[in-house]
C-alpha cells in the first residue's frame, strides 16, 4: 500500500506537495494498521488479514483516495469509530465506546459531510448491544456534540468568526446519475461486481461465525449499504465516495477469500483481476 501511494505521488507531483504526500502516506498506512487490527481483534479471518489485502487492492483501483490527505484522514477517523463500535461485543464499557464513536464521527464529518451516516450506524450498534437501555441511544450524539464544542472552542480562539457547520449537512436530490469518466466507471463496475459476489457468498460468510461476530459483520454490511444509498442519491456526489463504499466491501469480501470450499484457483484469478485493474488505473 505504501508503494502504491508512493507511485501515485511520483506520477502526480504537480498535484501533491511534499508535506501533503508525507501526511497522506502516514494516514493511509495508519488506516492499513487499523484495518488489520480490527480484523484480527474481531477474528473475522482465521490466519490472514484478507480484508487488508482487499483494501490495498481497492485503493489501487480507486486512486482518488491518494489525491487528498484530508479524505484519507476522514477514512482514519471512520476506522477509529468502527474500532469502538465493533468492540462492543465484549459488553465492557458500552457507554464509553458509544460516546467515543460519536466523537470520532464528528472529526470524520469535518473531512467529508458524507460521514454523517455513521451516526445511524452508532444507533444500530446501540440496538444490537444495548437495546434495553434507552440512554445508550443518546451517547453517540453526545460524543458528536463534544467534538463539535471542542472544535468550535478551538476555532474561536484562533479565528474571529465561528465555522458554519450548516455547510456540513448532507444534500439529496434523489436523481441517480451514472455518467462518469472512464476511471470512475471502472470503479463503479468493480463495486457492482464485488457486490454481486458478496450477495452470492453471504450465507457462506455468516454461518461459520459466532453470534457477536455476525452482529459485527452486519454492522459492516449496514455501513456498506448506507454509503451506497447516499452515493446514489447525493446532490454533491464526488468520486471519493466510491472509496467509502470500498471500505465496507474490503471487510466483507475479505471473508470470501477464506472460504475453505472455494477453490484456490478462483481466489487467485479474482485477486489478479483486481490487481490488474489497479495497475490499469496508473
Report each predicted region and the residues it spans:
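Membrane-water interface signatures at transmembrane helix termini and the short loops
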Residues: 203-261
Amino acid at each position: 500500500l505504501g508503494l502504491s501511494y508512493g507511485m501515485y505521488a511520483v506520477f502526480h507531483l504537480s498535484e501533491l506537495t511534499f508535506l501533503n504526500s508525507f501526511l497522506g502516506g502516514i494516514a493511509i498506512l495508519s488506516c492499513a494498521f487499523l484495518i488489520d487490527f480490527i480484523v484480527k481483534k474481531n477474528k473475522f479471518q482465521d490466519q490472514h488479514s484478507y480484508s487488508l489485502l482487499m483494501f490495498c487492492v481497492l485503493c489501487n483501483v480507486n486512486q482518488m483516495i491518494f489525491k487528498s490527505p484530508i479524505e484519507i484522514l476522514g477514512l482514519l477517523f471512520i476506522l477509529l469509530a468502527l474500532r469502538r463500535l465493533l468492540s462492543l461485543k465484549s459488553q465492557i464499557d458500552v457507554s464509553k465506546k458509544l460516546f467515543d464513536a460519536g466523537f470520532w464521527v464528528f472529526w470524520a464529518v469535518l473531512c467529508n459531510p458524507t460521514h454523517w451516516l455513521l451516526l445511524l450506524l452508532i444507533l444500530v450498534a446501540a440496538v444490537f448491544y444495548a437495546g434495553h437501555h434507552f440512554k445508550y441511544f443518546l451517547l453517540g450524539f453526545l460524543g458528536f456534540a463534544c467534538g463539535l464544542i471542542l472544535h468550535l472552542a478551538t476555532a474561536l480562539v484562533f479565528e474571529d468568526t465561528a465555522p458554519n457547520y450548516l455547510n456540513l449537512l448532507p444534500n439529496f436530490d434523489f436523481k441517480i446519475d451514472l455518467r462518469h469518466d472512464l476511471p470512475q466507471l471502472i470503479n463503479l463496475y468493480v463495486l457492482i461486481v464485488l457486490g454481486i459476489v458478496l450477495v452470492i457468498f453471504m450465507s457462506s460468510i455468516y454461518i461459520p461465525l459466532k453470534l457477536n461476530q455476525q452482529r459485527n459483520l452486519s454492522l459492516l454490511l449496514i455501513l456498506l449499504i448506507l454509503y451506497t444509498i447516499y452515493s446514489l442519491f447525493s446532490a454533491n456526489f464526488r468520486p471519493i465516495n466510491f472509496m467509502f463504499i470500498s471500505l465496507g466491501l474490503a471487510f466483507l469480501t475479505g471473508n470470501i477469500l477464506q472460504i475453505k470450499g472455494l477453490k484456490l484457483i478462483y481466489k487467485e484469478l479474482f485477486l489478479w483481476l483486481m490487481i490488474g485493474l489497479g495497475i490499469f488505473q496508473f
